[in-house]
Amino acid sequence: MMERFEKIEMKIPAKAEYVAIIRLTMAGVANRMGFAYDDIEDMKIAISEACTNIVQHAYKEDVGEITIVFGLYEDRLEIMAADNGVSFDFSSLKSKVGPYDINKPVEHLPENGLGLYLINTLMDDIQIMHDEGMTVLMTKYIQREQVENDGNPISTYNSY
């Protein structure tokens, strides 16, 4: 039997000024699901990094769009960020991504790759697929003992 979930899908222009819309939407969804404040802040950073990577690298000078899909499950939130722009070989890049030596001065940190390192560190799971463009699937599980819910959580089941 397939696991039940609800889906929210958004498309925005791949421009820096629209990344905040995705971040705010994700924070609202995560809050209603019952995620703790710190987990929401981590997810905000991760989704910002994923979208910023698309804005900076996927379309170069062209204007494309970012597709964001939120999968709301009983125990987790899955966030997919996708583009149809220029792809890159994640396997070769992953070997160059963190961890970083904390004893080295900040001037010696690489300029590229920190976003993927942050996403990988802040989320519970990350998968990256690249065919026609790039798709980043990030997962964060709800830690029930830390739930700070000010209302009723979103149900992933229809009540009718």
Swiss-Prot record:
Name of the protein this chain belongs to: Serine-protein kinase RsbW
- Assigned EC number: 2.7.11.1
User: Which is an annotated Pfam family here?
Assistant: HATPase_c_2
The yes or no answer to whether the keyword Nucleotide-binding is present is yes
- Top-level enzyme category: transferase
Identify the keywords attached in UniProt to this record, alphabetized.
ATP-binding, Kinase, Nucleotide-binding, Serine/threonine-protein kinase, Transferase
Question: Which organism's genome codes for this protein?
Answer: Bacillus cereus (strain G9842)
Family assignment? Answer: Belongs to the anti-sigma-factor family.
Under the heading InterPro entries, the entry gives: Anti-sigma-factor_SerPK (IPR050267), HATPase_C_sf (IPR036890), RsbW (IPR010193)
Identify the domain of life.
Bacteria
Q: What does this gene product do?
A: Negative regulator of sigma-B activity. Phosphorylates and inactivates its specific antagonist protein, RsbV. Upon phosphorylation of RsbV, RsbW is released and binds to sigma-B, thereby blocking its ability to form an RNA polymerase holoenzyme (E-sigma-B).
**Catalysed reactions, semicolon-separated:** L-seryl-[protein] + ATP = O-phospho-L-seryl-[protein] + ADP + H(+); L-threonyl-[protein] + ATP = O-phospho-L-threonyl-[protein] + ADP + H(+)
GO MF terms listed in the record are:
ATP binding; protein serine kinase activity; protein serine/threonine kinase activity; sigma factor antagonist activity
